[in-house]
Curated annotation (Swiss-Prot):
One GO cellular component term noted in the UniProt record for this chain: plasma membrane
Keywords, in A-Z order: Repressor, Transcription, Transcription regulation
Organism: Escherichia coli (strain K12)
GO biological process terms, semicolon-separated: negative regulation of bacterial-type flagellum-dependent cell motility; regulation of single-species biofilm formation
Family: Belongs to the YdiV family.
PANTHER family: ANTI-FLHC(2)FLHD(4) FACTOR YDIV-RELATED, CYCLIC DI-GMP PHOSPHODIESTERASE PDEF
GO MF terms, alphabetically ordered: cyclic-guanylate-specific phosphodiesterase activity
Domain of life assignment: Bacteria
Disruption phenotype: A double sdiA/ydiV deletion mutant leads to decreased cAMP levels which inhibits quorum sensing system 2. Repressed by glucose. Unlike the case in Salmonella typhimurium, disruption has no effect on motility or FliC levels.
Functional summary from the UniProt entry: Upon overexpression acts as a novel anti-FlhC(2)FlhD(4) factor, decreasing its DNA-binding activity, able to negatively regulate expression of flagellar class II operons including FliC.
Gene (name only): ydiV
Protein name: Putative anti-FlhC(2)FlhD(4) factor YdiV
Entry's induction text: Induced by extracellular autoinducer AI-1 (Vibrio fischeri autoinducer oxoC6), in an SdiA-dependent fashion. Repressed by glucose. Induced at pH 5.0 in an RpoS-dependent fashion. Very poorly expressed in both rich and nutrient-poor medium due to inefficient translation (at protein level).
């Protein structure tokens, strides 16, 4: 996708791996970077997303969906899930247009990722749009603990998977109270979702500290993102 702000930028997609405690690949998050045409300038993705029109939101989502479709045999063969970021604009289109929704439902390995800053997340199942989405698609909360919402949507069972925010993990792990605190969180949200993931696993030291807590999966800079042409390297040990 190409977009013009003060300059012309193009999008590049990468697969950010998600691994279990044995470092076996269980899924990926599809992330997008925006760079200038010559590749010398990168602009924050959040800044680009904030300036997209509804049509551009869907264009970007469609391009990401096409990329995942091109790799579907890889995901099916290795029994992996793939997270695709869901913006409110795309959510509206999925709810209002059956042809858009039907296309996505063809690929059950795709899960839709939202963050705590998603509009009206605090309403939980009282948010009719979010409830409707959760009844049709697997939803993932990507940054629990970022401090932008309550846990009502989690307790209402709207998410298939919940990932603890990377900054939350990295800040709390230095405290003596980390173990009882994390175990209390796990006990609270385990009945509400199928999978709890720890983000922010950026070093071997953090990995060693987090492993005893038996999270279902882990994500962080310890396992860097790869471009689409290197996706098969993610399952090589």
């Amino acid at each position: 996708m190409k977009i013009f702000l003060e300059n012309l930028y193009h999008s590049d997609c990468y697969f950010l791996p998600i691994r279990d405690n044995q470092q076996v690949l269980v899924g990926v998050e599809l992330i997008t970077h925006f760079s200038s045409e010559d590749g010398t300038v990168r602009i924050p993705t959040s800044r680009v997303i904030a300036q997209l029109t509804e049509e551009q939101h869907w264009q970007l989502f469609s391009e990401q969906l096409e990329l995942l479709k091109s790799c579907q045999h890889f995901f099916i063969q290795h029994k992996l899930f793939a997270w695709l970021n869901l913006t409110p604009q795309v959510a509206t289109l999925l709810l209002e247009r059956d042809n858009y929704a039907g296309e996505l439902l063809k690929y059950p390995f795709i899960e839709l990722l939202i963050n705590e800053n998603y509009p009206h997340l605090n309403e939980g199942k009282d948010n009719r749009g979010l409830l409707s989405l959760s009844q049709v698609y697997p939803l993932v909360l990507g940054n629990l603990g970022a401090g932008n919402s309550t846990m009502k949507a989690v307790f209402d069972g709207l998410f298939t998977r919940v990932m603890l925010d990377k900054s939350f993990i990295q800040q709390q792990i230095t405290h003596r109270s980390f173990e009882p605190f994390i175990r209390a969180i796990q006990a609270q949200i385990s009945p509400c979702c199928n999978c709890i993931i720890a983000g922010g696993i950026d070093t071997a030291e953090i990995l060693a500290q987090i492993t005893p807590f038996d999270f279902h999966a882990l994500q962080g800079c310890l396992w860097p993102a790869v471009p689409i042409n290197q996706i098969t390297t993610l399952v090589q040990r």
